[in-house]
A protein has these predicted regions:
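Charge-rich, low-complexity N-terminal segments
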Residues: 1-75
Length: 75
């Protein structure tokens, strides 16, 4: 089963651009996913389990590197 995930990241810091760029760079490292970046969100498309795992791992990596952020995901 394929899925489309539309995800927005809202970093909890004044310098919000580096965490957003970091998220986009990290999610683009996953193979077999179609990633499309828009000004306000990133769309991840692919096989359900693979796409969900990629988003989960990317959020975890960004939390470790950039600390707190709010994520809004539409699945």
């Amino acid at each position: 089963m394929n899925v489309t995930i539309d995800i927005s990241m809202y970093p909890n810091k004044e310098d919000f651009i580096p965490p957003i760029k970091g998220f986009i760079e990290k999610i683009n490292c996953y193979e077999d996913l179609k990633i499309t970046t828009f000004p306000t969100s990133t769309v991840v498309q692919g096989e359900y389990n693979h796409a969900m795992k990629a988003v989960q791992e990317t959020i975890a990596k960004c939390y470790e590197e950039f600390n707190m952020a709010v994520y809004v995901a539409k699945i």
